[in-house]
Swiss-Prot record:
Keywords in alphabetical order: Chloroplast, Membrane, Photosynthesis, Photosystem I, Plastid, Thylakoid, Transmembrane, Transmembrane helix
Keyword Ubl conjugation tagged: no
Gene Ontology cellular component annotations, sorted alphabetically: chloroplast thylakoid membrane; photosystem I
Domain of life: Eukaryota
Species per Swiss-Prot/TrEMBL record: Euglena gracilis
Record-stated family: Belongs to the PsaJ family.
HAMAP family (UniProt xref): PSI_PsaJ
Membrane topology field: Single-pass membrane protein
Name of the protein in question: Photosystem I reaction center subunit IX
Job of this protein: May help in the organization of the PsaE and PsaF subunits.
TM ranges: 7-27
Subcellular location: Plastid, Chloroplast thylakoid membrane
């Protein structure tokens, strides 16, 4: 479990999670307010 948490805190994993969150947030905003972007 220690190695798994160390793996999750590495920079590429954090970047992938952050970009996925940002992209899904933009998609949802664009779905409800399509003319804002």
């Amino acid at each position: 479990m220690k190695y798994f948490t160390t793996y999750l805190s590495t920079a590429p994993v954090v970047a992938v999670l952050w970009f996925t969150l940002t992209a899904s947030l933009l998609i949802e905003i664009n779905r409800f307010f399509p003319d804002i972007l």
